[in-house]
């Protein structure tokens, strides 16, 4: 199932672009350009989710955009990353 997770972009004047995902504490990435950031952010998120699945952790539902805006403010830049997440089926 494709899930869309919101990343919050950070960029200081003399730094690369950084991104963090509010739904996954500790999942961060960087890129020297926005295009590089998109690639690296998707890889980081996939790796983070794979680790959670391997550890038997539940994958959170994506936050809703208005909730992220309320928490982190409108002045931030955001990036939405689509990730295929396998659903757990309990038999």
Where are these regions (language model features)?
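Structural detector for hydrophobic anchor residues on beta-strands
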Residues: 5, 17, 27-29
């Amino acid at each position: 199932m494709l899930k869309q997770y919101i990343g919050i972009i950070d960029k200081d004047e003399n730094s690369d672009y950084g991104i963090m995902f509010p739904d996954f504490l500790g999942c961060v990435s960087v890129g020297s350009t926005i295009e590089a950031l998109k690639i690296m952010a998707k890889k980081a998120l996939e790796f983070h989710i794979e680790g959670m699945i391997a550890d038997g952790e539940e994958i959170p539902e994506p936050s809703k955009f208005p909730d992220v805006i309320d928490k982190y403010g409108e002045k931030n830049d955001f990036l939405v990353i689509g990730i295929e997440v396998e659903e757990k089926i309990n038999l």
